[in-house]
Amino acid sequence: MSFVATQTVRRLLGASFAFVLACSSLQSYAHGDVVPHSVDTSTLPQLGEKWLDANPYSTGPANKEALRIGASAYNQNCARCHGLEAISGGISPDLRKIDNDCTELADEAKKNACYQEINEYFVATVRRGRARDGRVYMPPFEGILSQEAIWSIKTYLETRRER
């Protein structure tokens, strides 16, 4: 093989390697920054250390502000897995449907008990994450997201319910 042919082959191999490396690095960033982001909830009524059983922002004067903060917090911390606007791509649970079973109940006491159970499940999952067989399916956000931030995200998801 001539010197020119050898140099050409080396350049092609080098360019191919660089292309593959560039593409693989783009793939690793496909879901964006994976570092969880804290959320500024200073404009919301503070809830204290004890975790509440029900979403204090579902109704009332803080609802609109909680919705604004929750939408931003969701997009920063949840959308990479659960989808933009809470529309899942099929890999992670579709959070628009988290309390669908509750909304269909006619008995008000059963409906309230169902919402209570969903709230407990939601908060526990966000705080502690979910793992099975040594695999992390959802990272824990305890110490990163405050109670106010988590309830704000839940407020946002309540407006995204699929009916």
PLM regions with names:
Residues 17-22:
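Hydrophobic alpha-helical targeting segments used for export or membrane insertion
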Residues 35-73:
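Electrostatic cytochrome c docking/interface patches
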Residues 2-16:
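Bacterial N-terminal signal peptides that target proteins for export
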Residues 30-39, 89-98, 125-161:
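Axial heme c-ligation environment in periplasmic c-type cytochrome domains
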Residues 67-71, 83, 87-127, 137:
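Gly/Gly-Pro-rich "capping" loops immediately C-terminal to redox-active cysteine motifs
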Residues 25-27:
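N-terminal signal peptide c-region/cleavage motif recognized by signal peptidases
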Residues 70, 74-84, 138, 153-157:
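The canonical Cys-X-X-Cys-His
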Residues 73, 162-163:
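Short sequence/structural segments immediately N-terminal
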